[in-house]
Regions:
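Long, low-complexity, charged/polar intrinsically disordered regions in eukaryotic proteins
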Residues: 1-20
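Short, cationic-aromatic polyanion-contact patches
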Residues: 16-32, 46, 79-105
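Short, locally clustered residues in the helix-turn-helix/winged-helix DNA-binding domain
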Residues: 28, 37-41
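Residues within the helices of the helix-turn-helix
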Residues: 37, 47-48, 66
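Short acidic, hydrophobic short linear motifs in intrinsically disordered regions
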Residues: 42-53
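Glycine-centered, phosphate/nucleic-acid-interacting loop/turn motifs that mediate DNA/RNA or nucleotide
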Residues: 43, 72, 78
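Short amphipathic alpha-helical interaction segments
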Residues: 55-70, 76
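Amphipathic alpha-helical dimerization/coiled-coil segments
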Residues: 97-161
Length: 162
């Protein structure tokens, strides 16, 4: 396998072991991946829509949604809706920033709008840039080393494309 034969996604994971374990359990499951793929990236996704839109049992769906909330992939809330004379409470979920990154990781690239790709790459780069600065400060590494690497890779890519 060559250096260019790698998956070009880098995803941050939480520090807490329990949250990482929950995320891995979601990503290793067909139920978890299906639910993530069916989440709205911007806006609420209602629990009832996930139950109607998949072939999995209510119990499995609710269990995986709870795992995702515990892992900080999703935030949840309740909404009261009036239908006729009845008031019904419905549960909704929205992806956190971390959740959006995992959803985008699972989606085919052609389904992701270019402006969302740009925004997401900026967010992830910001997280890694702040981590690199912290590591450089803690270990006495010159930050210019990383600037040079980025400039070299950009130059190599530009030369290759011309």
């Amino acid at each position: 396998m060559g250096d260019n034969d790698i998956w070009h996604y880098i995803l941050p994971f939480p520090f807490e072991n329990e949250k990482r374990r929950l995320i891995w359990s979601v990503l290793q499951s067909k139920v978890g991946k299906t639910l993530l793929m069916n989440m709205n990236l911007d806006g609420r996704t209602y629990q009832r829509d996930l139950i109607k839109g998949t072939s999995y049992s209510n119990k499995s769906i609710i269990e995986y949604l709870k795992r995702m909330v515990s892992a900080d992939i999703l935030e949840q809330g309740m909404e009261q809706v009036t239908t006729g004379k009845r008031k019904v409470r419905i549960k909704w979920y929205v992806p956190t920033k971390l959740g959006r990154w995992f959803i985008l990781f699972l989606k085919p690239t052609e389904e992701i709008p270019p402006d969302l790709v740009r925004k997401t790459i900026e967010e992830i780069f910001q997280v890694y840039a702040s981590s690199i600065v912290e590591v450089c400060e803690n270990f006495g590494i010159d930050i210019d080393l990383f600037r040079k690497i980025l400039n070299k890779e950009y130059s190599n890519k530009t030369i290759t494309e011309t």
